[in-house]
Amino acid sequence: MLTDPIADMLTRIRNAHLALHKEVSVPRSKIKESIAAILKQEGYIEDVATEEAEIKISLKYFKGKPVISGLKRVSKPGRRVYVGSTDIPKVQNGLGICILSTSSGVLAGTQARDRKVGGELLCEIW
């Protein structure tokens, strides 16, 4: 049993990128589907296909290099990190995104800032 399924998802994406795989499968959950949808919307992955028990993520490359150069889990099961709408960080001086779990659902940092909602800072991607 996994204690942190979101960290497992990010690690699978990181490892697949380093091995130059075209796609990666992760066990399915609603929050992981939301995170994958945000990654697709922001242009970090090619496509997301949801099957019965897993999510297939098609990875994106540019000139043979992974589009995602870094992933970081911020809020962990042992230490949760919450931010207000005015404290949402800019990742890599605006070149990356952060993903938050808010009362309005899972949102990218820019969406949360626009809606003026804070929440749990799940991860940073750049």
UniProtKB/Swiss-Prot annotation:
UniProt superkingdom: Bacteria
SUPFAM superfamilies, sorted: Ribosomal protein S8 (SSF56047)
GO molecular function, a single term: rRNA binding
Stretches assigned to coiled coil: none
Purpose: One of the primary rRNA binding proteins, it binds directly to 16S rRNA central domain where it helps coordinate assembly of the platform of the 30S subunit.
Family: Belongs to the universal ribosomal protein uS8 family.
Record's subunit section: Part of the 30S ribosomal subunit. Contacts proteins S5 and S12.
Protein name as it appears in the record: Small ribosomal subunit protein uS8
Organism: Nitratidesulfovibrio vulgaris (strain DSM 19637 / Miyazaki F) (Desulfovibrio vulgaris)
